[in-house]
Amino acid sequence: MGYNAGSYDVIVIGAGHAGCEAGLAAARMGSKTLMLTINLDMVAFMPCNPSVGGPAKGIVVREIDALGGEMGRNIDKTHIQMRMLNTGKGPAVRALRAQADKFSYQHELKKTIEETPNLTLFQGLVERLIIEDGVCKGVITQAGAEYTAKTVVITTGTFLRGEIIMGDLKYSSGPNNQQPSITLSEHLEELGFDLVRFKTGTPPRVNSNTIDYSKTEIQPGDDKPRAFSFETTKFIMDQIPCWLTYTSTETHRLIDENLHRSAMYSGMIKGTGPRYCPSIEDKVVRFNDKPRHQIFLEPEGRNTQEVYVQGLSTSLPEDVQRAMLRTIPGLENVEMMRTGYAIEYDAIVPTQLWPTLETKKIKNLYTAGQINGTSGYEEAAGQGLMAGINAACRSLGKKEVILGRADAYIGVLIDDLVTKGTNEPYRLLTSRAEYRLLLRHDNADLRLTEVGREIGLIKEDRYERFTNKKLQIEQEKERLESIFIKPRPEVQELIRSIGGSELKDGIRASDLLRRPEVTYEHIHLLVPSEVALSDEITEQVEIQTKYEGYIEKSLQQVERMKKMENKKIPVDIDYDAISSLASEARQKLKDVRPLSMGQASRISGVNPADVSILLIYIEQGKIARVSNQ
């Protein structure tokens, strides 16, 4: 027998990385919000790698922070190591990565949630949604509690019909042996949602006291203080190193001999795994010409001896895992503390979503995170933030927010999901962004702080600091444009010392900075600023000056794309009435229901001829419409 348990503006199902961002965003925007989770002790849990960031993903964390989300602030408070990656490459691919103290990360984020006004956190298992006339009105828990809401966000991660698999052992479970969510998955199928079966995995954890670190290579963090959040002013200087080792020929022999016992190769696993995070079995089979593979030993926290064996994700049986670990240099006498495993779970086909992450079938119902077919904490958090923002906007009667492909990696991620779909766990890569020179780690605040302020997630004091930063950047760029540097002896000496060509005539400071060997520090030595400028400001001045021509080209491409994005397609257009469309294009357009010509052009199976036919049809103005959209 059910009972009325309360009414809310927004209900978030799940409290992983997507759920935490969704709940916090909705509450901070003024929506009365309820977060329901299977286990309160697992809020913001990291079931796989104890890290945040990396290529593309680190930029997402910066974007989350620029919009007013929490992940960046939280990892800045709880990391054990920070490293800037790809420092020898251009600014488009530089990204920050942090090793997390996974237990502190959980504790701090749960504390933030508990202290946030408008936000209630409750332990309960959601089994059904309350649906009336195609509109989501709330949720029903296993205990019979009926919570009503204006909007609902599902962020169930890998819990939907989750199954853990190790060798021939298979049992129903969420990650880390938590209770799975079975009934909700069945309910989503009853509602007509298409679900797919995906798989991911995790490596074993070992006892640090039993590792011989003398046989490994130390991987320290950066000496220079780093942060994900633009608000962070206190930096953790006491860093803990990671360690690098490798598999051996004995490791590979052992895996080859036991492939028939791997759930991946025995046929026990049916779900599709992540292409960019293969198991060790996959690596040995697919890259059998490689004599060894990298293994990173990553501490799971400051107050634990557990070490994450990055690069050894596996579904081999426990006895094989024990033996395999001891074939790796430095791990000859290691004690395994947790086994690695594969986990299969249900995900929704993401082309069933609008770009707001609202489902097309059920109004006021949003989904975010691994349920949408992605992998990774950062991808989940970015989706959770946008779903939470849009659920709150809907509940408050405000216009929803859609980030474009030229606005943010989050925009690329969501557009890829809802436009192209995915047939494997989706991982964000820099190569997926066509405007990656514009979507850099360093300029996330310049791109998105205005958006965060408009929706109410950026406070006035932070916005004031942001506008002051923008002003200082422009003033310094103008100063360098106005100053001429003459070929004085000290100038020529500096240029020679860095391998540059001597000046023949005077040169603008900005033009000298455009030389590849010249940095802002060199310019500062020659013509110092009278105003003390932060590293963030001088970095922007240097990047914007050096890459001005390339940035301008990218902006021109964006303007051309915007013309297509601004050509809107009615949601209820009847594609069957456009007889000239190719049959595959017609079906894909009906499935995705793009909102613009730009989105239509990115659907696989819709070729340029189909786009032209659709554009002409819409411009003629006589648009046939379907009644059920």
Curated annotation (Swiss-Prot):
Cofactor dependency: FAD
One Gene Ontology term, aspect cellular component: cytosol
Range of residues in the leader sequence: none
Keyword tRNA processing attributed: yes
Gene Ontology MF: a single term: flavin adenine dinucleotide binding
GO biological process: tRNA methylation; tRNA wobble uridine modification
UniProt entry keywords in alphabetical sequence: Cytoplasm, FAD, Flavoprotein, NAD, tRNA processing
Ligand binding (FAD): 14-19, 126, 181, 370
Matching InterPro entries: FAD/NAD-bd_sf, GIDA_C_N, MnmG, MnmG-rel, MnmG-rel_CS, MnmG_C, MnmG_C_subdom, MnmG_C_subdom_sf
Cellular compartments annotated: Cytoplasm
Keyword hit for NADP: no
Cross-referenced Pfam families: GIDA (PF01134), GIDA_C_1st (PF21680), SAM_GIDA_C (PF13932)
Family: Belongs to the MnmG family.
Known function: NAD-binding protein involved in the addition of a carboxymethylaminomethyl (cmnm) group at the wobble position (U34) of certain tRNAs, forming tRNA-cmnm(5)s(2)U34.
NCBIfam families: mnmG_gidA
HAMAP family: MnmG_GidA (MF_00129)
Name of the protein in question: tRNA uridine 5-carboxymethylaminomethyl modification enzyme MnmG
Organism: Bacillus mycoides (strain KBAB4)
Taxonomic classification: Bacteria, Bacillati, Bacillota, Bacilli, Bacillales
